[in-house]
């Protein structure tokens, strides 16, 4: 799988628009200002949080956690539980937003991987059943994330 990616690395990298790199760099450089509404607007657009139609209360809780992550390490499972406690919609619906949680952790430590549907599909992983308990879903996703951390380090170390 990686052999094919390495073979076509130029083509793969050429699909990344320069604006995506400069916006990522700006977000990383200005992370200490994550409580600023202007920063949050750019962050939400970059990480496609607006498409998820998250309610303002969830976004407030999210950026509070992003701010907290700058002074202490937050495990993914704890972050997922904390964010789950805040409804994601105005109607009070809660949902497990592990992708956004992984992006939050990545912002604080860019050596941490990002988990989203594209990554999940690349590795042929399957989402946990919504019939599983919250703890069961978090444990399944945490196992995926641990695998990604190990895989990320393996790729960086061994190409």
Report residues per predicted region.
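Short, locally clustered residues in the helix-turn-helix/winged-helix DNA-binding domain
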Residues: 106
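An N-terminal alpha-helical hairpin/helix-loop-helix interaction module that forms a charged
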Residues: 1-93, 109-159
């Amino acid at each position: 799988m990686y052999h094919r990616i390495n073979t076509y690395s130029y083509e793969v990298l050429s699909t990344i628009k320069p604006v995506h790199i400069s916006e990522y760099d700006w977000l990383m450089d200005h992370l200490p200002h994550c409580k600023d509404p202007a920063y949050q607007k750019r962050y939400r657009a970059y990480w496609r949080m607006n498409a998820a139609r998250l309610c303002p209360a969830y976004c407030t809780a999210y950026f509070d956690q992003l701010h907290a992550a700058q002074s202490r390490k937050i495990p993914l499972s704890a972050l997922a539980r904390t964010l789950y406690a805040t409804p994601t919609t105005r109607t009070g619906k809660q949902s497990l937003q592990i992708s956004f949680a992984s992006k939050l952790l990545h912002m604080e430590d860019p050596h941490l991987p990002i988990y989203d549907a594209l990554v999940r599909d690349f590795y042929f992983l399957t989402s946990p059943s919504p019939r599983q308990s919250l703890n069961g879903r978090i444990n399944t996703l945490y196992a995926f994330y641990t695998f990604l951390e190990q895989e990320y380090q393996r790729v960086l170390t061994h190409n």
